[in-house]
Design a protein with these regions (language model features):
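Active-site-proximal binding-pocket segments
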Residues: 25-32, 42-51, 59-66
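Beta-rich accessory regions
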Residues: 40-50, 61, 114, 119-173
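Well-ordered alpha-helical segments within folded domains of soluble proteins
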Residues: 25-41, 89-103
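Catalytic cores of secreted or luminal carbohydrate-active enzymes
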Residues: 87-128
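Generic preference for well-ordered secondary structure
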Residues: 19, 32, 85-86, 128
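Extended glycan-interaction surfaces of carbohydrate-active proteins
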Residues: 1-27, 60-83, 99-102, 106, ...
Length: 173
């Protein structure tokens, strides 16, 4: 289902596949972002980062703005994602996709009512340093800086325990 730019809505091997149809083979950035997050959540970080890198590449190739969808034509055949004729750009959930991807890179999982926040960043290849400032958390603003394996966090409220490992999918509080 991977086109080289993102996850298609239908695999190329399936009957009915049409890479330039709305729902039968196109790539929707928000679907890809959800898959990126799910793969990382269940420990498949390398797979997650492969999709994340492809989505970043698509965004760069499309001028820094992810559209609602683009065609599912294979990256091996085209140097940039092929647009979908009536795709909206900007489009709300496509515009939100990079935020989910950023949270996924940080593996940020706040559970404020229970007094815990998990943070275990993993930078994808090509990103050497990341700084995110002003993250709202329990009435405070948090800054996270990542460079390689070094992580520096400022602004965590005293009543929040910072857990510096990924939260296991089945973790109960």
């Amino acid at each position: 289902m991977f086109s080289g730019w993102g996850v298609r809505t239908l695999a190329a091997s399936m009957p009915g596949y049409n890479p330039i149809s709305y729902h039968c083979g196109s790539v929707w950035p928000h679907d890809t972002a959800i898959v990126v997050a799910g793969l990382a959540r269940y420990g498949l970080v390398e797979h997650s980062q492969r999709l994340l890198s492809a989505l970043i590449d698509a965004g760069v190739a499309l001028g820094g703005r992810l559209p609602e969808l683009f065609s599912g034509l294979d990256r091996a055949e085209f140097a940039c994602p092929v647009g979908y004729p009536t795709s909206c750009s900007p489009q709300a959930w496509a515009a939100a996709s990079p935020l989910l991807c950023l949270r996924t890179i940080m593996r940020l999982d706040p559970w404020v009512p229970y007094g815990k926040t998990w943070l275990a960043p993993t930078l994808p290849e090509g990103i050497k340093r990341l700084k995110v400032a002003g993250i709202p958390l329990a009435g405070s603003r948090v800054t996270v800086e990542v460079e390689g394996d070094d992580v520096h966090v400022e602004g965590i409220p005293d009543h929040i325990e910072l857990v510096t490992e990924p939260r296991h999918p089945a973790t109960a509080v």
